[in-house]
Amino acid sequence: MAIVVTITSGKGGVGKSTTTANLAIGLAESGKKVVAVDFDIGLRNLDMILGLENRIVYDVVDVMEKNCNLSQALITDKKTKNLSFLAASQSKDKNILDKEKVAILINALRADFDYILIDSPAGIESGFEHAILHADMALVVVTPEVSSLRDSDRVVGIIDAKSNRAKKGMEVHKHLIINRLKPELVANGEMISIEEVLKILCLPLIGIIPEDHHIISATNKGEPVIRTDCESAKAYQRITRRILGEEVEYVEFKAKRGFFSALKGIFS
């Protein structure tokens, strides 16, 4: 039975879709059968990050409205064994989703995959509640900014109140991904520190992605950065291993001496 992992955020533009794409590839390359599902109806871009935009014929709404069957809509990534993709509709209204149709889709996917990664709309947008409804695990992507943290705190509350697991008295395993970290700005007091982020959101940390220009270049080429050897690629690989249950040390990025010693202390 598949594990449903919803990748979400409190606001848009924090790297949620990029994170979904790279973790989907990481899990697939670890031997897991993975499907990445784009639930961001009307604003899809997961297809471009994966380099699959030219292969879309049917989308998730077509499946739910029975315009096609699921196998017709699923796209197999030719570059990554074990990875499939289900695109969001670019033209339909987000309100077209309903709980019954979403449940049918997720149950069908559970039968065939080890991991279902859902790229959720941001928490302030319509459709968010459908994306977190069936989550076993939620990865909350934030940037070290006040607005991102504030909106993400609201998202955590919705997950704890409205997911199916929460309604059954079970916990959705929530973890924090801090994206676009600039250690030099933290060291200078110009960016919120990791320790402060953890205190504000009270979620366990599963990974830190440093600011990296390679991500922009990779996205523009439709080649997810995890396939490269840059620092952000290694960060996504470490998060993948943690999702799979490995204990992976948190590494030091280049910054003023002493900055990451505090981080190490949190996990010692």
UniProtKB/Swiss-Prot annotation:
Q: Where are the transmembrane segments?
A: none
Tell me which SUPFAM superfamilies the record gives: P-loop containing nucleoside triphosphate hydrolases
Bridged cysteine pairs (disulfide): none
* Bilayer topology term: Peripheral membrane protein
Return one Gene Ontology term, BP aspect. Answer: division septum assembly
Q: Where is ATP annotated to bind?
A: 11-18
Which residues, by range, are in coiled-coil regions?
A: none
A GO CC term? Answer: cytosol
Does ATP-binding show up as a keyword for this record?
yes
Listed GO MF terms: ATP binding; ATP hydrolysis activity
Q: What is its main location?
A: membrane
Q: Which family does it belong to?
A: Belongs to the ParA family. MinD subfamily.
Q: What's the subunit arrangement here?
A: Interacts with MinC and FtsZ.
Tell me, in a sentence or two, what this protein's role is. ATPase required for the correct placement of the division site. Cell division inhibitors MinC and MinD act in concert to form an inhibitor capable of blocking formation of the polar Z ring septums. Rapidly oscillates between the poles of the cell to destabilize FtsZ filaments that have formed before they mature into polar Z rings.
PANTHER family in alphabetical order: SEPTUM SITE-DETERMINING PROTEIN MIND HOMOLOG, CHLOROPLASTIC, SEPTUM SITE-DETERMINING PROTEIN MIND HOMOLOG, CHLOROPLASTIC-RELATED
- The name this protein goes by in its record: Septum site-determining protein MinD
Report the source organism. Helicobacter pylori (strain ATCC 700392 / 26695) (Campylobacter pylori)
